[in-house]
Structures are given as structure tokens and as C-alpha cells.
Amino acid sequence: MMEGGETLSKQTPWDWMTYPFSSVKTDGDLLYAASPGNGIYCSDESGGWQHISEQLPAELVVNRLQLNQGKLYACTNEGLYTFEDGQWEQPTHAVPCYQYKTSGQCSFMSTDYGLWHRCGDGAWHKVAYPERKVYDFLNVPQFLILGHEEGIAVYDRFTDEWADFPLGVGVTSLTVYQGHLLGAGEGGELIVGNKGGGFDVVSFGNRLVFTLIRHGRDVYACTDKGLYRIGYLCGQITMFAVKLGFPVTDVDTHDGQMYMATLFEGIQQMDLP
């Protein structure tokens, strides 16, 4: 069993057959990875791996990792943790957190109690849907879009109104592909905006969609069967295989390489398609 602070080789970083990974992020030559129940790890340019979360509670569950201006943010079941210069900053609110993003000088996080917001180093405030779990969000010029436990909500800044779209399924991930709003349902569905003011909930047989990741113009779907790329076939949104053979939970890219967090195969690396 791996102990906190133990350095590990990059070739066999840990018992990769038993460690599931939920999130991966690249920061130059640094690679961060989170394993539910096992902590957060960092690989440096020398190829060594370090357990960096030994200061954090043992029962901590990391939902997502994010990077911004050299800081690592861990969205966890006990709040938003920040890692910088080898030290962790405790969350100001012990509220389960699922996503963190910035917009200018302001920050947003999705929580068990809606969407929260702060500017600069000010206090966090609830801004939308405090009665629902919000899993993900998109902040675009005209709209603020939430994926929550019952579906999707859209705030129109021009009309100052919210529109709620109950879908009968929680939406845990959001992105945009060629004008379509896309989401991942908590039951493994792909949620597709139909450009007609509604959404279609699409199932792909025995494939379960975990999350959607945008890279440039491409959108990738992490699934229980592997990694897929979103595209069109006969005018319909579909998924094209990129890398199959193991469940992929998250991806990130750097310098022409793609890094995949997997459930049973550790952190996998391949050339960017």
C-alpha cells in the first residue's frame, strides 16, 4: 500500500490495476491526477510521482481538478481546496463542490446548494438555484447555463430571465459543439440541444458517457468503453471512437499529447488525434 509522500516511478507509478482515476490536469511539465479514496498525485519533469494530498482528510473525494494561474483547485465533497507552492488552502465553506471556473476577476463554483460566485478575494455568495445540486456550468456572453440534478437551466442576460428544462436526469457535464449545447447525463446519456429550444436525451446502447471535454474545436466524450470524439453522421450528432479498451473518466492535453484518466489502466498517454 502506498504511503503519503512516497516517490514513485513514472513507468509503474502505483498499483495501476486497482487505483481508479477521476481527473487529470496538465500544467507545463507537471501532471496532476486524482484517485477517489487514494488522494491527489503530481508527476514532475524528472518522471517521479509524488503524493501531494497527505495533508488533506483521508475521506476526501475529489470530483474535479482545475488549474488557473499556477494554482491547482480540487473540487471535493468537503469544499474547494487550493494548492500552491506545496501548500493546501482550506475551503472557506465546507460545501460539496463539483466544478470551479473563473471569468475575469470573478470565480464561480457549482455546489450541492446551487451556483456560487465571488470577485477577487471577496466572500462567496449563492447566485442561482440554491435548492438544487449544480454539477457543471457554462458562462458565455449571452447565457449562463447550469447542469443540475434535474436537467438544465439557462439564464438569458438580455431578457434577465431563467428558463428551466427538466429532463428527468441530472446533467453532470456541459459543453458546446458547433452550435449544439451538449451534456452528459448522470445515467450515462448524451444530452443534445436540438436548436429548437429543447433537448434530446440520447442513449448509445451499452456505452455510458461520463463527461465531455472540449479541446479547440473538438469535443471528446469519456465513456465506460473508452474515448470518443463527437461528430456528425447523416446530419445527427454521434460519437466516433478514438481510443477503446478501458473506461476513460477525464482527459487533458499538452504539447501534442493527450493524457487520459482511466478506471483500471492508470494514466494513459497518446498522441493528440
Tell what function each PLM region has.
Residues L31-A33, K71-Y73, S107-F108, W116, ...:
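Conserved beta-propeller blade signature
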Residues E186-F240:
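Intrinsically disordered, low-complexity segments enriched in Gly and acidic/Ser/Thr residues
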Residues L146-V201:
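Aromatic-anchored, glycine/proline-accented short structural segments
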Residues G5-G28, Q50-Q69, E89-C106, D112, ...:
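Short coil-to-beta transitions that initiate beta-strands within beta-rich domains
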Residues C222-E265, L272-P273:
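C-terminal closing repeat unit and adjoining cap/tail of repeat-based domains
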Residues E3, D44-G48, F83-Q87, C119-G122, ...:
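Short loop/turn segments that connect beta-strands within beta-propeller blades
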